[in-house]
């Protein structure tokens, strides 16, 4: 991670899904014998990695109909954009993280969600209000976000961020979940 931070200081503190041996030692060795490097700041990161365990949360959750919200309970970006763009949007948030929000409909259609629940990554609640309270976010903003997103699903057009894929079903079937 020292090499990552050397070239991308904005990634300080973020965990990696790489194996422990991926430290850049080979690059450092080659530099010592005179090799040049290019584009070292071009580091691909995944936007949804559980930050305590470095466990990658599959894109299939977002693709199944989940949304991303910030600590205030608001959507802030097109969840289905490319990894680099979604990651950059999350890094730009003051809190540097986002919640993946989904309901029972998404959970039932995505086996990975049950794995995340079993591993303890998921916060669940019987209602959006209870979920917002558990996450320490403003319930009214969160409910407005869900209502607005559900309207986009109904008309199959995201007026806010231009999401054109995975507008599968409204997020309204309890329990509600967050990673």
Give a label for each model feature.
Residues 11, 41-45, 72-79, 152-156, ...:
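Short linear motifs at secondary-structure transitions and domain/linker junctions
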Residues 141-179:
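A glycine-rich dinucleotide-binding beta-alpha-beta segment and adjacent secondary-structure elements
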Residues 1, 30, 142:
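Conserved hydrophobic/aromatic pocket- or pore-lining residues that grip, position, or stack substrates
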Residues 21-28, 140:
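Short alpha-helical basic/polar micro-motif
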Residues 10-22:
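A short acidic, glycine-rich active-site loop
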Residues 11-12, 52-56, 179:
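Intrinsically disordered, low-complexity segments enriched in polar/charged residues with Gly/Pro
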């Amino acid at each position: 991670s020292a090499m990552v931070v050397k070239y991308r200081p904005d990634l300080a503190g973020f965990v990696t899904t790489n194996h422990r041996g991926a430290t850049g030692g080979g690059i450092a060795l080659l530099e010592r014998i005179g090799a040049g490097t290019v584009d070292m700041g071009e580091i691909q990161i995944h936007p949804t990695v559980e930050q305590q365990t470095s466990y990658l949360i599959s894109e299939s959750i977002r693709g199944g109909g989940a949304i991303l919200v910030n600590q205030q309970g608001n959507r802030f970006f097109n969840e289905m954009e490319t990894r680099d763009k979604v990651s950059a949007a999350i890094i730009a948030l003051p809190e540097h993280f986002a919640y993946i929000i989904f309901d029972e409909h998404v959970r039932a259609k995505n086996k990975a969600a049950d794995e995340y629940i079993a591993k303890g990554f998921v916060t669940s609640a019987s209602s959006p209000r209870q979920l917002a309270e558990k996450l320490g976010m403003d319930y009214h903003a969160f409910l407005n976000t869900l209502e607005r997103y559900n309207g986009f699903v109904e008309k199959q057009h995201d007026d806010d961020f231009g999401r054109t894929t995975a507008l599968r079903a409204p997020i309204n079937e309890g329990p509600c979940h967050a990673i």
